[in-house]
Every structure is written in C-alpha cells, then in structure tokens.
Swiss-Prot record:
Protein name: Pyrimidine/purine nucleoside phosphorylase
Primary enzyme class: transferase
Sections of the chain in a coiled coil: none
Keywords: Glycosyltransferase, Transferase
SUPFAM superfamilies on file: RmlC-like cupins
Documented EC number(s): 2.4.2.1, 2.4.2.2
Main function: Catalyzes the phosphorolysis of diverse nucleosides, yielding D-ribose 1-phosphate and the respective free bases. Can use uridine, adenosine, guanosine, cytidine, thymidine, inosine and xanthosine as substrates. Also catalyzes the reverse reactions.
Catalytic activity of the protein: a purine D-ribonucleoside + phosphate = a purine nucleobase + alpha-D-ribose 1-phosphate; adenosine + phosphate = alpha-D-ribose 1-phosphate + adenine; cytidine + phosphate = cytosine + alpha-D-ribose 1-phosphate; guanosine + phosphate = alpha-D-ribose 1-phosphate + guanine
Gene field: ppnP
Database matches in InterPro entries: Ppnp, RmlC-like_jellyroll, RmlC_Cupin_sf
A Gene Ontology term for the protein's cellular component: cytosol
Keyword Secreted: no
Amino acid sequence: MSEFNNVSVVKEANIYFEGKVTSRTVIFPDGSRKTLGLMLPGEYTFNTGSAELMEILSGEMTVVLPGSPDPVAIKGGEAFEVPENSSFKVNVTAVSDYICSFL
C-alpha cells in the first residue's frame, strides 16, 4: 500500500536525537496509530512501550534486537518486529524512510 486514506495527521513532529530522527503520527479511523519517519545516518537506541513493527521503505541500517547480541542488516523493503517494553539499537548507514506500526 503506497498511501493511507481517511486518516488524521498530528501536525507536530516527533523529534529525537537532536533532529536526526523525525516522524509524524498518523491516526486511523479505528484509533490505531502509525508513525511515518526519517532517520539520518547515526547510532540510536529506542525504547518501546508497546510492540512495534518497523517497515523500512528505503535506506540501510543494522539493528540489534532484544535478546540478540548480533546486529542484523536491514534495507529498504524489509521489516522487523520489536517486543513491548524493550529497547533496540540501530546503526543507520544511509538515510532511512520508515513506518512504525504499534501492535
């Protein structure tokens, strides 16, 4: 799906890591939320409240997921899941466009 229809968008941006990671929140008619964002090259650690599905639309990164010491290479067209109440580390090597779905 290349677009979302009949949604609301929160105008205020979510800005993290001194502006190197930004996103906008999209609210669907059923109340579910996703964020659409961009990550610039760098290393970042994110904490989760709920489980997340991270879809990488373009770009490249390595990800260290909870319970795994080894980084996994992720590129545009791929996705990964993160459990609730955990954290994950990313090393973004190319500007990355993403969708985060809260599961």
